[in-house]
Amino acid sequence: MSVDAATVRKIASLARIAVTDGDVEAMVPELNNILGWIEQLGEVDTDGVAPLAAVIPNHQRLRDDVVTDGNIRDKVLANAPQAEHGFFAVPKVIE
C-alpha cells in the first residue's frame, strides 16, 4: 500500500486538519515510510511467541477493594448550601 497526495489531503480533511501543499508533499514520503515499517512487522515470524500485554511484569499495588462509608460526610456536607440531619437539603419540587 502506498500513500499519494490525494490520500493525504483526504485524511487531513476527515481529521479537520489544515495542510498546505508543501506539508502534503512532505507527508507523502513520511507516511509511505511508516507504512513500509508496518509491512515489515507483518513479515515477522511470531509462531511460538506468547502474547504480551507489557514488556516488563506489572504488579498492581492496589489496596483491597472494601466498601466503607468514606468517613468524610461532614467534610462533604460543609460544601453544601444547606444540610439537615446529615443529608443534603434541597427545595421541594413536587406539588
UniProtKB/Swiss-Prot annotation:
Allows the formation of correctly charged Asn-tRNA(Asn) or Gln-tRNA(Gln) through the transamidation of misacylated Asp-tRNA(Asn) or Glu-tRNA(Gln) in organisms which lack either or both of asparaginyl-tRNA or glutaminyl-tRNA synthetases. The reaction takes place in the presence of glutamine and ATP through an activated phospho-Asp-tRNA(Asn) or phospho-Glu-tRNA(Gln). This is Aspartyl/glutamyl-tRNA(Asn/Gln) amidotransferase subunit C. Belongs to the GatC family. Its EC number is 6.3.5.-. It comes from the Bacteria. One of its GO terms (biological process) is translation. SUPFAM superfamilies: Glu-tRNAGln amidotransferase C subunit.
